[in-house]
């Protein structure tokens, strides 16, 4: 893989405006009930609340990819995790495996009767020819092929949501944290990895 395309959400900058969610829905014309991106607020209404924009994180070692029985989920050369709707059987294994809740299904009810899985594509389309009508209908707009950032990150007014090569956006985030003058770890890191203050 040449680049490792990732998202980072800077919780110190996210203001819970949901602009990223709206940009994604508008850009990709996703069906009602399918939300490729959402904003989650922890301790809502309490001083010190934190909001974070969540979607597929395009994991290097993606658990959804590991459990898919039809191999419809795959990595691109840039490290983006995409899926092939023609191979999806709607089993829902990816939904159970993903810690971010990224895989979405268009209908309610039992798995295998909920339709084809949908998720964030990092605005990179799918296996159909780049920028084709077939690609847009199944996966949304392929902004990466157009040389653009994902719509959610490009729209973010506070630049809380960063998208791009992991090394580059990681450096931007490190510079921000150094400027703030406290820990270099992402919010929630100490809880997730049991590194609380002693």
Model-predicted segments: where are they?
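Non-ligating segments of multi-cofactor redox enzymes
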Residues: 1-198
């Amino acid at each position: 893989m040449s680049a490792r395309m990732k998202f980072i959400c800077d919780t110190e900058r996210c203001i819970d405006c949901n602009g990223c969610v709206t940009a994604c829905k508008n850009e990709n014309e996703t069906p009602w009930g399918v939300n490729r991106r959402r904003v989650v607020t922890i301790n809502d209404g309490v001083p010190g609340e934190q909001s974070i924009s969540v979607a597929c994180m395009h994991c290097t070692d993606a658990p959804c990819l590991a459990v898919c029985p039809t191999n419809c989920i795959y990595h691109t050369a840039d490290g983006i995790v995409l899926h092939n709707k023609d191979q999806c059987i709607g089993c829902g294994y990816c939904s159970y495996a993903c810690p971010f809740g990224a895989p979405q299904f268009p209908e309610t009810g039992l798995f295998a009767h909920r339709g084809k899985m949908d998720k964030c594509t990092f605005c990179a389309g799918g296996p159909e020819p780049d920028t084709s009508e077939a690609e847009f209908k199944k996966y949304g707009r392929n902004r990466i092929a157009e040389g653009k950032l994902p719509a959610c990150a490009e729209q973010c007014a506070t630049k809380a949501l960063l998208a791009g090569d992991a090394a580059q956006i990681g450096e931007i985030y490190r510079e921000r944290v150094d400027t703030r003058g406290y820990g270099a770890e992402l919010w929630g890191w100490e809880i997730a990895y049991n590194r609380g203050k002693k």
